[in-house]
Amino acid sequence: MNDNQELILKGRYTAYMEQIEKYYNGTIDRTQPIVIGMTTNALAISGADSSLELTINIKTLNKCIGSPDDIYHGHLLDRNIIEQLPFQLENPVMIFKNTEKHSLICITDLQDSSGHGVMVAVALEQINHQHTVNRISSLYGK
């Protein structure tokens, strides 16, 4: 059993995986963000508030998996990358401050279909449906 499976078995990301399944089978509430979990220690060490949930909006997820032919600036990431997201944010290769204020960039060890490393942009302390969260604002290969 790998570390990812152990985390799932412990229930830490079970709700996230259920939401991703609903997203892909079309039964998710598209008006609500997907909750990945609490902000990871790695992000907290880099300046994120660890008491906040980490989320991704459906619109952002659509852009991340969409084809550039179908969605403006679609990133065409496959489902496996989306499913690995929480685990990659637990232990990213590197985190640095983005040029955007109140934002971090996480470098993962995942690769997109073109062989580019996958990066995750996290906007810190964002208001989302009247709650403050740390929100994934983009996920792409570069």
For each feature predicted by the language model, list its residue ranges.
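Ribonuclease/tRNase effector modules and their secretory precursors
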Residues: 1-142
